[in-house]
Amino acid sequence: MSTAGDDAVGVPPACGGRSDAVGVPQLARESGAMRDQDCSGELLRSPTHNGHLLVGALKRHQNKPVLFLGDTRLTGGQLADRISQYIQAFEALGAGTGVAVGLLSLNRPEVLMIIGAGQARGYRRTALHPLGSLADHAYVLNDAGISSLIIDPNPMFVERALALLEQVDSLQQILTIGPVPDALKHVAVDLSAEAAKYQPQPLVAADLPPDQVIGLTYTGGTTGKPKGVIGTAQSIATMTSIQLAEWEWPANPRFLMCTPLSHAGAAFFTPTVIKGGEMIVLAKFDPAEVLRIIEEQRITATMLVPSMLYALLDHPDSHTRDLSSLETVYYGASAINPVRLAEAIRRFGPIFAQYYGQSEAPMVITYLAKGDHDEKRLTSCGRPTLFARVALLDEHGKPVKQGEVGEICVSGPLLAGGYWNLPDETSRTFKDGWLHTGDLAREDSDGFYYIVDRVKDMIVTGGFNVFPREVEDVVAEHPAVAQVCVVGAPDEKWGEAVTAVVVLRSNAARDEPAIEAMTAEIQAAVKQRKGSVQAPKRVVVVDSLPLTGLGKPDKKAVRARFWEGAGRAVG
């Protein structure tokens, strides 16, 4: 084996250990202060980051299993050794300090080692969604200036890597998690084999300034061209601290990771290790496999997006598998159907906890605890975190009265560093001392927030504002409806007509009289609950709703169906 000398892995050559950043806005800029000044003074009160948390947790649990790797279990100490080997490999391959690296992979345990190396060292990483298009992937890699791309070497990603090499000027090499396929022999290196060449070294977190750029997360693109949200050392560490302080965790977490580690799934890595838990990683979400693993591995916690929860509810095995070990199911990323949530609570018990956030203030803006899931609060996203300033503001930046609709605005160390290479967009979103989330909400007398919609999704019909989310909550209560998406369709009289696009439950009647009756019942229910302005002018039945790569209903795609050829556009 090669060695990297006697130095501990992760210790920077100087106090900064900074990665280069180009085009970072004022909110997260590169500064030479820590390199140019006396290091001890700068670091005296410098906050810890996720690398410190992870390295410390792995040491604390060095003899305890923390990760399944195939048929074997890795202890905290063994995982730290693997991470140290990956750090040495990244530095040797020119994919470590000072460069931008992309990741395209299905879920696999090695991805957590790659993520761990990035957290410990402060590397700048950008994850690509496994289901993203070639055009989206090329845009992200070009925008982020990616020079190396790590891939899971399955045929789909090998083909994608070859195409990206043709379209991304900055892309110089491919790193595979496993043997290099013949098609990539000329340009790829087996990252796992390279890491195995090195002797494990003591794992030590690099000292990073709070505004260190450690990742770019690209927005889903449902409201326009994807934007690179700058993840900083401070932002991610704040998120993790809030997860640990305010969220409910099993005493002995056995966490099933079945959502993409390229996105929200990875946010549960460090907290689970800190809690002394063990992680089981599934390559992808499959309802039968998830239910089997929960039973056989006695899983105590997992994280799902709503569409995954619906799939579990609709699978026959959810009635026969022993799921009694499951203590906590975190859910978020998109609005949940309150009727289906109530069904899930009846089926699985009061084990559900909702989180709300966005890339610009990740995951922890609000939290709806398990015990707060009573019938009247199933449409709530919870109470605001105590570790950030959260307010509902009107269009003039003033707080709204309780019960009135305002935009959720956030400030504090949770905030991301702005948008990559988009100073004007950064100034529009991070302004007047607040992050303006674009989400509209009301607050009840107990301090619980209820999101009514996105600012950009609001429908203007006949001069009145309609919030689709409120209409969707009523439509979802109809017994024939499995999923619903409400959008504004062009209308000569009203400007926009409230239109409900629904997916029927499997046992619902689909003949014309049944559809007509359902439409009338939905219109009457919305009119009674919300008013005649909110009542859908049309109810359109479809086989399925288009989803984004993150599993959210793609309202932009649904809306486009009605606006194509209209001669004007909304949103």
From Swiss-Prot:
E.C. designation(s): 6.2.1.2, 6.2.1.3
Leading EC class: ligase
Listed InterPro entries: AMP-bd_C, AMP-bd_C_sf, AMP-binding_CS, AMP-dep_synth/lig_dom, ANL_N_sf, ATP-dep_AMP-bd_enzyme
Function: Catalyzes the activation of medium/long-chain fatty acids as acyl-coenzyme A (acyl-CoA).
Lineage, highest ranks first: Bacteria, Bacillati, Actinomycetota, Actinomycetes, Mycobacteriales
Keywords: ATP-binding, Fatty acid metabolism, Ligase, Lipid metabolism, Nucleotide-binding
Family: Belongs to the ATP-dependent AMP-binding enzyme family.
GO molecular function terms listed in the Swiss-Prot or TrEMBL record: ATP binding; long-chain fatty acid-CoA ligase activity; medium-chain fatty acid-CoA ligase activity
Pfam families given in the database record: AMP-binding, AMP-binding_C
Listed GO CC annotations: plasma membrane
Catalysed reactions, as listed in the record: a medium-chain fatty acid + ATP + CoA = a medium-chain fatty acyl-CoA + AMP + diphosphate; a long-chain fatty acid + ATP + CoA = a long-chain fatty acyl-CoA + AMP + diphosphate; hexanoate + ATP + CoA = hexanoyl-CoA + AMP + diphosphate; dodecanoate + ATP + CoA = dodecanoyl-CoA + AMP + diphosphate
Pathway connected to this protein: Lipid metabolism; fatty acid metabolism
Gene3D superfamilies named among the record's database cross-references: 3.30.300.30, N-terminal domain of ligase-like
TM region(s), chain numbering: none
Record's protein name: Medium/long-chain-fatty-acid--CoA ligase FadD8
Chain positions covered by the region annotation Disordered: 1-22
The gene coding this protein: fadD8
Native source organism of the sequence: Mycobacterium tuberculosis (strain ATCC 25618 / H37Rv)
